[in-house]
């Protein structure tokens, strides 16, 4: 089972003050050579995921656009299937479906949605994935789980990409990553979610990545093809002075040293050439071929594109 895949690069964002701004951003992402634009699913200060994805798909020709990620607790999986299949159908097969268990306690509290224990939220998401996959089949779905019940529902419409758009599931814990390794087309290695909500910002070391990838490979051992492996960049800086930049970024991540920062697969610092070499090495060592930028700094889109250009076709 080989991990080797060509590089793909993406950005995740959901901010725009107008239709024109959003359309121009999507077209800019495509023009700069990125493979994907992904849209988060959060309440505060963000565009709504489904219409933003459809707008970006409609504004571009080749760019793949996805959810990063649909929070399972915000919608029923039958609705999620219908929205995902419709997005794929209306884009001629350019949608990518990301789904997660939810982790940001604050937005649960703001909206009155119960923030259940991690085990319950993950179990509910696991059932949701089974419902979504079941609705992709031709026959009516009957499903009786602990969290969802479906009686004779036929999934419609059917997506262009069969049986479903590529499914992304990311996480930082063993249970979620093992499930992703068995069920997803794309597995994302992320900082682990804390039981009280939020993310463990120190959980981005090279040692953490090795441990998580061990869980993924063990769970995916019976699959004929290894899922595509994704890593999210939490920090990025184009600079000629890696050491100075690493010292500054270490102060932003509790418990990390400058060396930890330079070695972390979730952080990219240096010249464009140094970054390209780091990404080649990380693909060789870890298998990471799909890299997504998530910093929120406008200039980073153009700066990271320099790295994307160096690795085009590799």
Give the positions of each predicted feature:
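Active-site-adjacent structural elements that line small-molecule/cofactor binding pockets in enzymes
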Residues: 1-314
């Amino acid at each position: 089972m080989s991990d080797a895949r060509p590089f793909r690069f993406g950005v995740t964002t959901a901010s725009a003050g107008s239709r024109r701004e959003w359309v121009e951003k999507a077209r800019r992402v495509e023009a700069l050579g990125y493979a994907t634009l992904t849209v988060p699913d959060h309440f505060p200060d963000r565009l709504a995921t489904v219409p933003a994805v459809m707008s970006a798909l409609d504004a571009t020709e080749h760019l793949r656009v996805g959810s990063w990620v649909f929070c399972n607790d915000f919608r029923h999986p039958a609705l999620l299937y219908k929205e995902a299949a419709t997005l794929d159908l209306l884009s001629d097969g350019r949608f990518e479906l990301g789904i997660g268990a939810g982790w940001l306690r604050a937005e649960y509290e703001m909206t009155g949605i119960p923030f259940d224990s991690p085990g319950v939220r993950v179990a509910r998401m696991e059932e949701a994935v089974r419902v979504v996959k079941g609705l992709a089949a031709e026959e009516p779905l009957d499903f009786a789980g602990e969290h969802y019940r479906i009686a004779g529902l036929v999934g419609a419409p059917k997506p262009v990409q069969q049986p479903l758009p590529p499914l992304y599931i990311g996480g930082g814990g063993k249970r979620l990553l093992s499930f992703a390794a068995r069920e997803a087309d794309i597995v994302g290695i992320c900082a682990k979610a804390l039981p009280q909500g939020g993310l463990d910002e120190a959980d981005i070391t090279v040692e953490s990545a090795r441990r998580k990838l061990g869980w993924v490979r063990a769970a995916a051992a019976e699959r004929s093809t290894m899922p595509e492996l994704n890593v999210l960049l939490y920090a990025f800086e184009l600079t000629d002075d890696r050491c100075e930049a690493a010292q500054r970024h270490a102060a932003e991540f509790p418990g990390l040293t400058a060396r930890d920062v330079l070695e972390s697969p979730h952080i990219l610092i240096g010249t464009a050439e140094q970054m390209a070499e780091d990404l080649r090495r990380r693909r060789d060592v870890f298998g990471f071929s799909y890299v997504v930028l998530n910093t929120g700094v406008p200039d980073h889109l153009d700066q990271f594109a320099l790295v994307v250009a160096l690795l085009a076709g590799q």
